[in-house]
Amino acid sequence: MSETHFGFEKVDEAEKADKVAGVFHSVASKYDVMNDLMSGGMHRLWKMFTIAQAGVRPGHKVLDIAGGTGDLAKAFAKQAGPTGEVWLTDINESMLRVGRDRLLNKGIVTPVCLCDAERIPFPDNHFDLVTVAFGLRNMTHKDAALAEMRRVVKPGGKVMVLEFSKVWKPLEKAYDVYSFKVLPWLGERVAGDAPSYRYLAESIRMHPDQASLVRLMEHAGLENVEYFNLTAGVVALHVGRKY
């Protein structure tokens, strides 16, 4: 069986899927609180930028992959309106349940689907937009997932990847201290789970940098790929198009 990385640890591919699932089953109930604490609320601005770049209009069909607690799906559902179609999907049942309930509590009724991004259960050329926010780095076969995202996007549509990336070099040392000391400490104090947040830091370091992700998206068949560095490269938004 092939090996892959779970953070810095080398594991079998099947084992990684189980370990990642365990992380998100553990953090689901505290996910939103921890996002605010870990990013100082910046994740809301990163998502607002993504929503603005997406340009969703009434009637659009949108697929939100690894949609978690539904921040993007909530905004897209409002923009697409009753004539649109916005799917909230996640591979993790606990995260999907939290996201579904959160949307319902906001009065937003939109379809949800337990979905593996490497095997998307939708037809070719169906969506105007596919988004994945802070989910790609957890996928074992990123190339296969990106190819699937391209497959289900209509010609003229976009695939958008919002993900942690390579921080500006002068900030690397401070960012390492924050990632490997502060994040696990916060995880232990707030969620009672330091290991999951240690994995978060490690998974960020193992994720392709900005230029490497451009190449990965191009290899998947996406064109005119560009990226926007946010907060000195802590996060980057990559946008690829299908023609």
Swiss-Prot record:
Report the SS bond pairs.
Answer: none
Q: In which pathway does it act?
A: Quinol/quinone metabolism; menaquinone biosynthesis; menaquinol from 1,4-dihydroxy-2-naphthoate: step 2/2; Cofactor biosynthesis; ubiquinone biosynthesis
Residues bound to S-adenosyl-L-methionine are 69, 90, 116-117
Kindly list the biological process annotations in GO that this record carries: aerobic respiration; menaquinone biosynthetic process; methylation
Name the reaction it catalyses.
a 2-demethylmenaquinol + S-adenosyl-L-methionine = a menaquinol + S-adenosyl-L-homocysteine + H(+); a 2-methoxy-6-(all-trans-polyprenyl)benzene-1,4-diol + S-adenosyl-L-methionine = a 5-methoxy-2-methyl-3-(all-trans-polyprenyl)benzene-1,4-diol + S-adenosyl-L-homocysteine + H(+)
Return the broad EC class: transferase
Q: Name one GO molecular function term.
A: 2-methoxy-6-polyprenyl-1,4-benzoquinol methyltransferase activity
Q: Which CDD domains does the annotation name? A: AdoMet_MTases (cd02440)
Q: Which InterPro entries match?
A: SAM-dependent_MTases_sf, UbiE/COQ5_MeTrFase, UbiE/COQ5_MeTrFase_CS
Question: Mind listing the UniProt keywords for this protein, alphabetically?
Answer: Menaquinone biosynthesis, Methyltransferase, S-adenosyl-L-methionine, Transferase, Ubiquinone biosynthesis
Q: What's the EC number here? A: 2.1.1.163, 2.1.1.201
Family per record:
Belongs to the class I-like SAM-binding methyltransferase superfamily. MenG/UbiE family.
* Cited function: Methyltransferase required for the conversion of demethylmenaquinol (DMKH2) to menaquinol (MKH2) and the conversion of 2-polyprenyl-6-methoxy-1,4-benzoquinol (DDMQH2) to 2-polyprenyl-3-methyl-6-methoxy-1,4-benzoquinol (DMQH2).
What is the recorded name of this protein? Ubiquinone/menaquinone biosynthesis C-methyltransferase UbiE
- Species source reads Cupriavidus necator (strain ATCC 17699 / DSM 428 / KCTC 22496 / NCIMB 10442 / H16 / Stanier 337) (Ralstonia eutropha)
| Taxon lineage | Bacteria, Pseudomonadati, Pseudomonadota, Betaproteobacteria, Burkholderiales
Q: Per UniProt, what is the name of the gene that codes for the protein in this document?
A: ubiE
